[in-house]
């Protein structure tokens, strides 16, 4: 039996093309979008302002396509990690992070990752597949706590700019008036920085941008992050200087502080020199140990001194709270054990 195509994850333009192809009236595209993204239905039968004839026509080859998570793990700090199926024998993880008045969902954009960053478990898993816009949006649509969400960060498994077409479609659905109608200020996309995709992302999306930096020294960054060899951080900064981040859109840099590696004042000074002239902020992140990686995280005193030095010299810097470490849901720790099981079987 042929599987049906999901409506979830279709942009308004795609829905308009679909209804035209099926001989439905043009206004049906916005009606379907409203059912999917505003009313968040799970079946075509619920789309009651479409005639029975058109609902039956849609159901011949299409379905909403909502897929609930198949597993969940709960941390002592309230963080919840969800496992979603994304095609045959493929899975991704999303992390729900409640925090007082805010609730953030960290979503994935790929199964695995090609970037092979030294400090990241997803990179150790290798790359398997790009997620479709449907599979990206489903992580939000099918989240049990969906109605509590205030923010989405694309900082889960995968490199978003390596799957730019589907990521941009998902962002269009999240921010478009026909879709979830979220302000772009509620969404942050994190990237190692790919030459091919960075400029296009900045020009086609208004969402916040976070750059994985981790070292201001080219040779050291290349050792930690092979992507540096293709597009250096100095080139990236020069490109970023062509754009205005002084208004509502935020540019931030992510910096894991490693013990004895990049945690001295020398590195803080290099960061200030590298980022001079950019309207940006710095997020310091504690390293979470992963198997087979001989790196250690700096202690909190060192991180605090590092933060204070940057802040007093004009670079607004915060230390990101570490959440979900006990369930392997913290930064750099996402890697689906389920995927590994299937790969071995």
Swiss-Prot record:
Binding site for S-adenosyl-L-methionine: 158-159, 190, 212-214, 288
Residues bound to [4Fe-4S] cluster: 113, 117, 120
Cofactor(s) this protein requires: [4Fe-4S] cluster
PROSITE patterns, alphabetized: RADICAL_SAM
Any coiled-coil regions, as ranges: none
Main location group: cytoplasm
Family per similarity comment: Belongs to the radical SAM superfamily. RlmN family.
Name under which the protein is recorded: Probable dual-specificity RNA methyltransferase RlmN
Organism the protein comes from: Bacteroides thetaiotaomicron (strain ATCC 29148 / DSM 2079 / JCM 5827 / CCUG 10774 / NCTC 10582 / VPI-5482 / E50)
């Amino acid at each position: 039996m042929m599987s049906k195509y999901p409506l979830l994850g279709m942009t308004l333009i795609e829905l308009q093309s679909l209804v035209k192809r099926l001989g439905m009236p043009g206004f049906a595209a916005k009606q379907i979008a409203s059912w999917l993204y505003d009313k968040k239905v799970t079946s075509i039968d619920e789309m009651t302002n479409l005639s029975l004839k058109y609902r039956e026509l849609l159901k011949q080859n299409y379905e909403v396509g909502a897929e609930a998570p198949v597993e969940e793990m709960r941390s002592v700090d309230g963080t919840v990690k969800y496992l979603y199926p994304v095609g045959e024998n493929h899975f991704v993880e999303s992390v729900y992070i409640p925090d007082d008045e805010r609730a953030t969902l960290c979503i994935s954009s790929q199964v695995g990752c090609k970037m092979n960053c030294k400090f990241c478990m997803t990179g150790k898993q290798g790359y398997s597949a790009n997620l479709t816009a449907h599979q990206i949006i489903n992580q939000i649509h099918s989240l049990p706590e969906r109605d509590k969400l205030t923010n989405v960060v694309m900082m889960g498994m995968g490199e978003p700019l390596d799957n730019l077409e589907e990521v941009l479609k998902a962002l269009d659905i999240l921010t478009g008036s026909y879709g979830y109608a979220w302000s772009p200020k509620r969404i942050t996309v994190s990237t190692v920085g790919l030459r091919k995709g960075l400029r296009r992302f900045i020009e086609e999306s208004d969402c916040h941008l976070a750059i994985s930096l981790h070292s201001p020294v080219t040779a050291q960054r290349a050792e930690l992050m092979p992507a540096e060899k293709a597009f250096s951080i100095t080139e990236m900064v020069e490109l970023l200087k062509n754009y205005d981040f002084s208004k509502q859109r935020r540019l931030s840099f992510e910096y894991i502080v490693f013990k004895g590696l990049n945690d001295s004042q020398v590195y803080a000074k290099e960061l200030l020199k590298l980022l001079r002239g950019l309207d940006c902020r710095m997020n310091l992140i504690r390293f979470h140990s992963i198997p087979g990686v001989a790196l250690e995280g700096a202690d909190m005193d060192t991180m605090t001194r590092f933060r204070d030095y940057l802040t007093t010299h004009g670079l607004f810097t915060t230390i990101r709270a570490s959440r979900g470490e006990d369930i392997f849901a913290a930064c750099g720790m996402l890697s689906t054990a389920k995927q590994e099981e299937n790969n071995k079987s």
